Amino acid sequence: MSRRLLAAACLMLSFSAAQAAERWETLPPTPTAVAGAKTGYAAVNGIKVYYTRTGHGSPVVLLHGGLSNSDYWGNQVKALAAKHTVISIDSRGHGRSSRDDKPYGYDLMADDVVAVLDHLKIPRADIVGWSDGAIIGIDLALRHPDRIGKVFAFAANTQTSGVKDAVEKNPTFAAFIERAGKEYAKLSPTPKEYDAFVEQISHMWASQPNWTDAQLQSIKTPILIADGDHDEAIKREHTEYMAATIPGAGLLILPNTSHFAFLQDPALFNAAVLGFLDSK
């Protein structure tokens, strides 16, 4: 091999290595809906909530992040369904679920989850949440601890100050927001109301969540606080604060991933979830 070819080969290897090291900057495609899952709607709290159900075993509810939908959990549904009954929910106004004029709030969204469990006659379930879904999981631990077992809380915040400034300008996060708008138009029962939906939920984000140390310290539910080491949205010190404040909470930082770790490295994410849920 000539020196020129050798130099070119080394340059390509270096470029490939650099690309692999920047996985956290990628936004992999949204998974397709899981084939064979039972789907349905639950009439709860004045709206219709879409859900999927598949697998056998102890129940686990998957709660997605703001602006997205339950399809984002496709890689996790497949992995969890071997040992668990997996229920994936489109939160109110997201995906295929409807919304009404009630102001958005995490208490209301947590009450929706409890109502879906009632609809499905499931007395108790573990929660796996991402971003807003993780916040809903913590809300459930605070207000409905009798209905849940464990909470895997990925990329959550418990105070508005835990969110980084101008996160929407981050290229990966901006790409997600653009994708979410297109998916809303495709899936929503009100496909032309994305801007109104975003405005409605943004009022919640301006002031919620805002839990005190005392509230977090009252939690008795087993919780694992997890995040990617390059989260675009959540401050690392806030993630560490949550884990230190909630009694008995664990802390897990997934390497080379961001706010979208479940898409970027599903094998690592799934192993972390299963390891936590199935531990004694």
Residue map of PLM features:
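Catalytic histidine neighborhood in serine/cysteine hydrolases
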Residues: 243-260
